[in-house]
């Protein structure tokens, strides 16, 4: 029940009445008293005591969260326990920082059972007031796992996660049933096809270029890109869909696409830190300055943009995922 007790720092004290300092506490609860954390605890023999801790004092002796694993599939449950070995059964409280990813099904002072709801990352904390420890939990995305398994040539690739996202969002497809070809140069046809998908595959009514034949994967996308002014062709008649896209061409086409979507493209970065900025074609100067300002395109180093170099499929996936995220943030 409730009792009168004196609080001093330095460890557990039995509940008792003291003439100099009185606090009325309920057993099984935690309190902040001045700069002390006061915890009501029950020892293994069932005796109720109070422990007072200095602010910032290590709580490792009283809280140690453990579970069989930390990576879950959606729908899977897991029990997290306080496994700290000491003479006191601390009644800790549990919290979850992302209820969209995890839910706490049940908990008591010693353990907590969670269920994975959706892919993502979350952490479960257990402790007393501000004195808590956390256990990070990852909920796997089965679709991302499937994509990663389907394209072994992106395993351990620096752009692996962005490539998976680009495929998952329907922007990119593989170059074969089991190949993505991340280091292959992106072609003009591939770029406009990806942007066409990003735009929701709108229909095109105008004529295309003479070298864009019917029935190719890029046919409708190129017609749409020409009709909207996204691309102008190498000549008015020829597009060269299988030619590689340079980094400055990529910036220019993405810039036009953003304008087509009604985005503000006025943000311009100072490119003087890049020693090869002078090699940018005139048409690509503002687009590249915008893309760098918004963090969509970064230099291949701190001093090099390499505007004339071909963009790889991996680089394109990264840039387009950044754009996808940026566009969503503009609408927020």
What does each model-found stretch correspond to?
Residues 5, 11-26, 108-110:
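Aromatic sugar-binding surface patches on proteins
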Residues 1, 43, 84-86:
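Extracellular acidic, Ser/Thr/Pro-rich low-complexity tracts
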Residues 33-43, 122-128:
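Short, aromatic- and glycine-rich surface loops/edge beta-strands on solvent-exposed regions
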Residues 27-34, 116-120:
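Surface-exposed, short loops/turns at beta-strand junctions within beta-sandwich domains
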Residues 59-62, 138-160, 168-169, 173-221, ...:
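Feature responds to low-complexity, polar/acidic, surface-exposed segments characteristic
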Residues 2-14, 48-50, 100-103:
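Surface-exposed loop/edge segments in extracytoplasmic proteins
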Residues 43-52, 127-134:
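Short, exposed coil/turn segments at beta-strand boundaries within extracellular/luminal domains
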Residues 58-145:
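Extracytoplasmic soluble-region selector
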